[in-house]
Design a protein with these regions (language model features):
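Generic structural signal for well-ordered, non-membrane alpha-helical segments
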Residues: 39, 69, 191-198
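Conserved catalytic-core segment of NTP-binding enzymes
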Residues: 71-170, 178-179
Length: 209
């Protein structure tokens, strides 16, 4: 619901909290700060709970150069590692096209990575880049999910061209998805075709993992 969504604030933008936990002001590059700040209380304090699902917005860190270390990055990486180590939770992480939050120390706790692609060569090219980055840190359990698939030709294209990563399902293009967004209601509840397709992906994923 929109009222719950408005309660969320990205952790990466909580300057006072980051300074309190790391000992340095956000935006600081270099200098001294804590690389493993306390984060155990953050999931419950700064998330919202709806229908048994807890949502936490981590945010992103704008860095001037690759390999740059800053308090915000240390905070997010420590928080992500903490979430992976929680034994009683199922963690779903919606990430940008990359594996920047993952590392060799945490990869064993990742059951699978789903790479969502559209039926275009550019999208599949991005998927191959993600696969290489994931393999570089030891993550081998990658699977493709086709998104916004409009017809059999697009489904066939993905089946033929997705040779490097197993394809485990498709999410159909359905105008009711946009309708659900306009109405402010969950796609899962409003769009039966997407719900059925999602159940199929989950079933296949459970069989593979």
């Amino acid at each position: 619901p929109e009222e719950l969504r408005e309660e969320l604030k990205p952790i990466a933008e909580m300057d006072a909290l980051i300074e309190e936990r790391t000992g340095a002001k956000p935006g600081t590059v270099g200098g001294f700060f804590t690389l493993n700040p306390r984060v155990d209380d953050i999931p419950e304090r700064f998330s919202v709970l709806h229908r048994g699902v807890r949502l936490l917005e981590m945010g992103s860190v704008e860095l001037g150069g690759s390999g740059c270390i800053c308090p915000e990055a240390a905070m997010l990486k420590t928080l992500f590692t903490h979430l992976l180590f929680r034994k009683d939770d199922i963690l779903l992480l919606d990430m940008y096209a990359g594996v920047e939050h993952l590392g060799r120390a945490t990869v064993d706790f990742v059951d699978a990575m789903l790479v969502v692609v559209e039926a275009t060569r550019r999208s599949l090219g991005t998927a191959k880049q993600i696969k290489k980055l994931a393999n570089d840190i030891g993550l081998q359990r990658l699977y493709l999910v086709g998104n916004k698939v409009r017809n059999e030709d697009e489904a066939k294209f993905l089946e033929v061209e997705s040779k490097d990563i197993p394809l485990i399902g498709f999410l159909p293009a359905d105008l009711k998805v946009q309708e659900a967004d306009r109405l402010g209601i969950p796609v899962y509840d409003h769009v039966e075709s997407v719900k059925v397709a999602t159940h199929h992906v989950i079933r296949v994923l459970n069989e593979l993992t």
